[in-house]
């Protein structure tokens, strides 16, 4: 799997807006420790040569040097990112079911039914995410594989915004529930796509909605009322409301969240952890995000020795504050393993031909034209001379790192 983040967007916005969104999506992709392959710049010429609006003006210009420097620093770190067994902070084991057919129902308004801005999907995920739960995405097409349900305690699903392409998926879902899983079904099953000619209403099947087939497999009535039902060692909770209403109506997600909390308590034997942030360590990299519209307005405060990778100047910090609506991407210097060896820790250029001697360290740095190179270099001792292109550097900063 490759994750794609784009330093700009197709919609017409300004450079500042692009930068804010890029930081958010970049941090989000790093929150998946099982993925370490990325597409970093779709069509680089449009990023470096395109003209886009400057915030607060009608003027358009090419990418600001501050932003191109920061962008290149961020992209270069991906060369060092590896998969890891670490987990994002928070309660794990709560998932939301999705299927390929999600894309079949993108038409926003049909026969009096609408699902604006993918609201049914976000209605299932955002009430959990905004409370600090790292909700997992479970693909219906993967249910035949046993590892799909590994570690999963609660699974939320709805057929208001997608449909099962094959009836056999219901067998795997029902088997998981009977073995102890907690399934939460949200939906009124009234969208017009319920009546399209498909397997549940053809070839001898006479189900008015695919959920009727699922509930039958679970040993329930075809159209069960709202409530919680036992099923083998597990349980099924039915909420008769389309999940889009959990986000389209202010404060309307309480019943849904309470149902998820109760199911997790029953299945896992402990409470859901509520918080307003996410934190993940991947090697020396610290990725953090603090949420707005959450359970608290408190910022996240980190102490240590960090290089700020969202800052073009790569400042070394001993204290970092991340406020609601912001993200942080830091290089934790204290996590450097082994004895200190000369190396470029981070920077806005690609590094080639590194040569480390007993008293010297050299390398070739390459980056795009009309961009600024900034680097943080780790050395075992304080340098006597620093030369760039065989000329002594006029300006550089030297910091002695603490030994503890």
For each predicted feature, which ranges?
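A general structural detector for well-ordered alpha-helical segments in enzyme core domains, enriched
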Residues: 25, 124, 169-173
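Conserved small/polar residues in nucleotide/adenosyl-binding loops
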Residues: 397-403
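Short acidic/histidine-rich motifs immediately flanking catalytic phosphotransfer sites
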Residues: 150-155
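Hydrophobic targeting/anchoring helices
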Residues: 1-121, 224, 237-241, 246-250, ...
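A conserved amphipathic helix/loop scaffold
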Residues: 163-358, 375-377
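A short, well-structured beta->alpha microelement
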Residues: 127-147
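Short strand-turn-strand beta-turns centered on an Asx-Gly dipeptide
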Residues: 387-391
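Short proline/glycine-enriched turn/loop motifs at strand-loop junctions of beta-rich domains
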Residues: 294-295, 368-370, 378-383
